[in-house]
UniProtKB/Swiss-Prot annotation:
GO biological process: protein modification process
Miscellaneous note of the record: In the transfer reaction, the free carboxyl group of lipoic acid is attached via an amide linkage to the epsilon-amino group of a specific lysine residue of lipoyl domains of lipoate-dependent enzymes.
GO cellular component, one term: cytoplasm
Chain residues that bind ATP: R72, G77, A78, V79, F80, K135
Organism for this UniProt entry: Mycoplasma genitalium (strain ATCC 33530 / DSM 19775 / NCTC 10195 / G37)
Binding site for (R)-lipoate: K135
CDD domains named in the record: LplA (cd16443)
Entry protein name: Probable lipoate-protein ligase A
Alphabetical keyword list: ATP-binding, Cytoplasm, Ligase, Nucleotide-binding
Amino acid sequence: MQTFIITSPVFNPYFNAALEEWLLTEFRKNELVKVIYFWQNANTIVVGRNQNTYAEVNLKELESDKVNLFRRFSGGGAVFHDLGNICFSIILPRTGKVMENAYEQTTRNVVKFLNSLNVPAVFHGRNDLEINNKKFSGLAEYIAKDRLLVHGTLLFDTDFSKLAKYLNVDKTKIASKGVDSVAKRVVNVKEYLPNWTTAKFLEEMINFFTVTEKAETIVLTKDALAKVEKRAKEHFQSWEWNFGKTYEYNFKNKRYFNNAGLFECNVQVEKGTVVDIKFYGDFLSVVDITPVTKKLIGQKYDYKTFEKLFNELDHFSDYFGSLKPEQLLGVIFDNK
């Protein structure tokens, strides 16, 4: 079986996801080939296919720091990618032998490469790679017709502080039907290779796979590149894919403001759209707030969308007293 290897030329998560999908479904279609794909995403939160984006991510922090967000097409939990993290994908023909212990089988050479550098990496549990009982790689898989994809992250020099910052959502306030991410002890490979850079590590890993797998390098044609870019923009970068797939959930929040009193909101969301919203509290409105709630129902549950509506609302103070639009948004989206 012929093996091919490719490294993404960009750090754009939407392009990288689209390229991965193209390699899985279109490259050498109907041929028995193995593909090894390396890629990196700059400053990106990735949620699993079946996760609730709103439940997993602090969207205000992401927006403030200009962090990318996208939903991958495989399952698993939410993760943070930066350029200290390396992603790898291994695509194989779907056979009975491959499907047995797929995670361990497909990542053996990743472990061998690290072991060759005297890094004591091992496969552990169901889908993790560990060093001395600390996780440095989490794996997920996806099946497309006659092919199997196993992909994973490899933490080389990732900034772990970003995990808490962007994924630190108060789960007690969200009754979610999605799958919550589980925090695990993690480690950067760089702790065992302190003099190496991420770029050097990636280069050496590519060389290792090229030699051990006798792999041929893939060069994208202009036609393939155009298809990947189109798919990235129209699908993986779309609101419908990243938010619209979100499970139905109810959000409740309450806050007291010295200038405006107690304020509480209940929001019901289905497929990323507000289907019901109610406001309660002792804020000093002078008119019925029902027209505001009616205006919000049917809108995307999105900070910028709500901000625009509130800024365009005539006589905001008549509805919400001394409460400021940014304070109201903070309650609705759980931002301080």
